[in-house]
């Protein structure tokens, strides 16, 4: 049996058996039965079928073979797998038998780029049967029988097949619509001074001096001296100045409302672009982002104009205060105060509307930025997946669909009676010298053209680089020309 450290067959009746223990897991162990050949791969005719969830093509159809030599020692052989078999961190040569011992480390395949370890790592060990049995991986024939039983009992309903489904409009859209509806309500002048408590950050700090009193709820005005009398001409002059101020506020209010309508239209456009961004329309996203920036600039300009009008209003108030000094009429004072109070209420209503519009616009910009980031991440993920699929497809073409004679992808694939496939031109040239299969050396009795294999190769080549396509076209033309001569 060799040295004590060699990996030799255990006696299950004695309570101990040899197995490949899955590193870091209490399941998926592979039992090595005495006198049995153990094959591992992703195909159907193996002892243990391993199907990678991360990379389906990591494990070949018949990846490796484990069996005993005449002395009873277990060995492992790489059966020409794509990603190789590793014994103690060293890759094995294909079709060469290696002895394995207690504590040896076996790795099937290679780690992915973002992983440190491979998905299938095992350690050669001998354990008690009671310890091994709960952790064993089911054999392929057992899994087939189990799947047949489940398939006869399985019934799906529409409710089971229907997932949570696509949700309705996004929370972001409903939230923005809610804010827009709130800000779109008509502004009513209230005597209690219910105005925005937080002015815009871009406004002049002087405006805070006009903030309503928190205790009384009424606006606080600069000191107005008591007036006892006024001439009719002076009263008319002061009234016309107040009317002009009110007119200016009304014009500003109409501009703000127009700007809000533009923001609502832009919001609808953003939601429409959201659907287009899912299809990869990045140009439309960039254009919409530029339009949003232009709208923000327009809002800032309107805010600056409003600040200038407020300063002009303060100047008007000071001038009216100077005119009112020394005037002695109670009725004129009362009328003027009412007009000034109304003007200030409209001013604060305008400021509140401006703040709401600013918040709505900032919410739209934040939502758009978030959507752009998500779109970029999804595009990068899709590109990475596409490159991975092309890489795997190229590996499959190179390892499974190449002619062993010319080392090119099959051109007019022909399958012999021994089930090996070659190019039609290559096997015809070979048969001029020998009437036997180049791989298994069996006599060639029949040849069958495989149209399915040709169509599959042509479709897969269409997804490869232009160099591969051009080379294949040149080879097809050369072989057709040689066939004519």
Curated annotation (Swiss-Prot):
Autoubiquitinated through 'Lys-48' and 'Lys-63' of ubiquitin. 'Lys-63' polyubiquitination is mediated by UBE2N. 'Lys-29'-type polyubiquitination is also observed, but it doesn't require its own functional RING-type zinc finger. Changing residue 405 to A: Impairs interaction with UBE2L6/UBCH8 and ability to mediate 'Lys-48'-linked ubiquitination E3 ligase activity, while it still catalyzes 'Lys-63'-linked ubiquitination and still interacts with UBE2N/UBC13. One of its GO terms (biological process) is negative regulation of transcription elongation by RNA polymerase II. One of its GO terms (cellular component) is cytosol. Residues 38-92 form the FHA domain. Ubiquitous. In fetal tissues, highest expression in brain, thymus and liver. In adult tissues, highest levels in brain and testis, lowest levels in peripheral blood cells. Pfam families: FHA, zf-C3HC4_3. Its EC number is 2.3.2.27. Residues 181-220 are annotated as: Disordered. GO terms for molecular function: chromatin binding; histone binding; identical protein binding; protein homodimerization activity; ubiquitin binding; ubiquitin protein ligase activity; ubiquitin protein ligase binding; zinc ion binding. Pathway: Protein modification; protein ubiquitination. Residues 68-72 are annotated as: Required for interaction with PIWIL1. The modification Phosphoserine is found at residue 157. It is found in: Nucleus; Cytoplasm; Midbody; Chromosome, Telomere. It catalyses: S-ubiquitinyl-[E2 ubiquitin-conjugating enzyme]-L-cysteine + [acceptor protein]-L-lysine = [E2 ubiquitin-conjugating enzyme]-L-cysteine + N(6)-ubiquitinyl-[acceptor protein]-L-lysine. A zinc finger (RING-type) spans 403-441. Keywords: Cell cycle, Cell division, Chromatin regulator, Chromosome, Cytoplasm, DNA damage, DNA repair, Host-virus interaction, Metal-binding, Mitosis, Nucleus, Phosphoprotein, Telomere, Transferase, Ubl conjugation, Ubl conjugation pathway, Zinc, Zinc-finger. Homodimer. Forms a E2-E3 ubiquitin ligase complex composed of the RNF8 homodimer and a E2 heterodimer of UBE2N and UBE2V2. Interacts with class III E2s, including UBE2E1, UBE2E2, and UBE2E3 and with UBE2N. Interacts with RXRA. Interacts (via FHA domain) with ATM-phosphorylated MDC1. Interacts (via FHA domain) with 'Thr-4827' phosphorylated HERC2 (via C-terminus). Interacts with PIWIL1; leading to sequester RNF8 in the cytoplasm. Interacts with WRAP53/TCAB1. (Microbial infection) Interacts (via FHA domain) with phosphorylated human herpesvirus 1 ICP0 protein; leading to RNF8 degradation by the proteasome. E3 ubiquitin-protein ligase that plays a key role in DNA damage signaling via 2 distinct roles: by mediating the 'Lys-63'-linked ubiquitination of histones H2A and H2AX and promoting the recruitment of DNA repair proteins at double-strand breaks (DSBs) sites, and by catalyzing 'Lys-48'-linked ubiquitination to remove target proteins from DNA damage sites. The FHA domain specifically recognizes and binds ATM-phosphorylated MDC1 and 'Thr-4827' phosphorylated HERC2. This domain is required for proper recruitment to DNA damage sites after UV irradiation, ionizing radiation, or treatment with an alkylating agent. Belongs to the RNF8 family. This is E3 ubiquitin-protein ligase RNF8. It comes from Homo sapiens.
């Amino acid at each position: 049996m060799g040295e004590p450290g060699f990996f030799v067959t255990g006696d299950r009746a004695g309570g101990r058996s040899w197995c490949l223990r899955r590193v870091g897991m209490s399941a998926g162990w592979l039992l090595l039965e005495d006198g049995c050949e153990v094959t591992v791969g992703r195909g159907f005719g193996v002892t243990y079928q391993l199907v990678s969830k991360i990379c389906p093509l990591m494990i070949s159809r018949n990846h490796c073979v484990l069996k005993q030599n005449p002395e009873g020692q277990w060995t492992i052989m790489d059966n020409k797998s794509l990603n190789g078999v590793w014994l103690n961190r060293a890759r094995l040569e294909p079709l060469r038998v290696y002895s394995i011992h207690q504590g040896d480390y076996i790795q099937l395949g290679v780690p992915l780029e973002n992983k440190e370890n491979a998905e299938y790592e095992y350690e050669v060990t001998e354990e008690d049967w009671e310890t091994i049995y709960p952790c064993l991986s089911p054999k392929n024939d057992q899994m087939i029988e189990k799947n047949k039983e489940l398939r006869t009992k399985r019934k799906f309903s529409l409710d089971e097949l229907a997932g949570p489904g696509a949700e309705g409009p996004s929370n972001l859209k409903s939230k923005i619509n809610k804010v827009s509806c709130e800000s779109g309500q008509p502004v009513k002048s209230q005597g209690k001074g219910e105005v925005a408590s937080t002015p815009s950050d871009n406004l002049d700090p002087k405006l805070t001096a006009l903030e309503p009193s928190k205790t009384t709820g009424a606006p606080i005005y600069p000191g107005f001296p008591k007036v006892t009398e006024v001439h009719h001409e002076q009263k008319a002059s002061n009234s016309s100045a107040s009317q002009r101020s009110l007119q200016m506020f009304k014009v500003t209010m109409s501009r703000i409302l127009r700007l809000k309508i533009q923001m609502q239209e832009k919001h609808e456009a953003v939601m429409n672009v959201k659907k287009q961004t899912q299809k990869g329309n990045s140009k439309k996203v960039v254009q919409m982002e530029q339009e949003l920036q232009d709208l923000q600039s327009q809002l800032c300009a309107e805010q600056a104009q409003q600040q200038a009008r407020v300063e002009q209003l303060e100047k008007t108030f000071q001038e009216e205060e100077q005119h009112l000094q020394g005037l002695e009429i109670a009725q004129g004072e009362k009328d003027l105060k009412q007009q000034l109070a109304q003007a200030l209420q409209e001013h604060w209503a305008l400021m509140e509307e401006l703040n709401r519009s600013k918040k709505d616009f900032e919410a739209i910009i934040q939502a758009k930025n978030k959507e752009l980031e998500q779109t970029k991440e999804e595009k990068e993920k899709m590109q990475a997946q596409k490159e991975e699929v092309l890489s795997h497809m190229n590996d499959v073409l190179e390892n499974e669909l190449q002619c062993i004679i010319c080392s090119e992808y099959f051109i007019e694939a022909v399958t012999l009676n021994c089930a090996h496939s070659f190019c039609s031109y290559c096997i015809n040239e070979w048969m001029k010298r020998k009437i036997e299969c180049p791989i298994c050396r069996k006599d060639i009795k029949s040849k069958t053209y495989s149209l399915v294999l040709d169509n599959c190769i042509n479709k897969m080549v269409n997804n490869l680089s232009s160099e591969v396509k051009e080379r294949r076209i040149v080879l097809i033309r050369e072989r057709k020309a040689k066939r004519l001569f």
